[in-house]
Amino acid sequence: MKEGIHPDYRDVVFQDMSNDFKFITRSTIQTRETIEFEGASYPLVKIEVSSESHPFYTGKHKIVDTAGRVDKFRKKFGTVGSKTSVAE
């Protein structure tokens, strides 16, 4: 393998924001946040859904608050880039 071209592959903590579940895995993801976990400091990645909170794995239906995202997007960007018909 060539030297200096591969990203840093390291231990990272992923935190499920819906239930505060944390787990360590290895990743090349870059993050500015860190967390103390099991007596050591690790980079932290916050995620919305993990196997601890996803209905497929838990067997329970859970409503995730995502309402209003489309409206928020439309309010922010309006009709920028939308196709309009040209009258001939």
Swiss-Prot record:
One of its GO terms (molecular function) is structural constituent of ribosome. PROSITE patterns: RIBOSOMAL_L31. GO terms for cellular component: ribonucleoprotein complex; ribosome. One of its GO terms (biological process) is translation. Keywords: Ribonucleoprotein, Ribosomal protein. Gene3D superfamilies: Ribosomal protein L31 (4.10.830.30). Pfam families: Ribosomal_L31. Part of the 50S ribosomal subunit. This is Large ribosomal subunit protein bL31B. It comes from Janthinobacterium sp. (strain Marseille) (Minibacterium massiliensis). The gene is rpmE2.
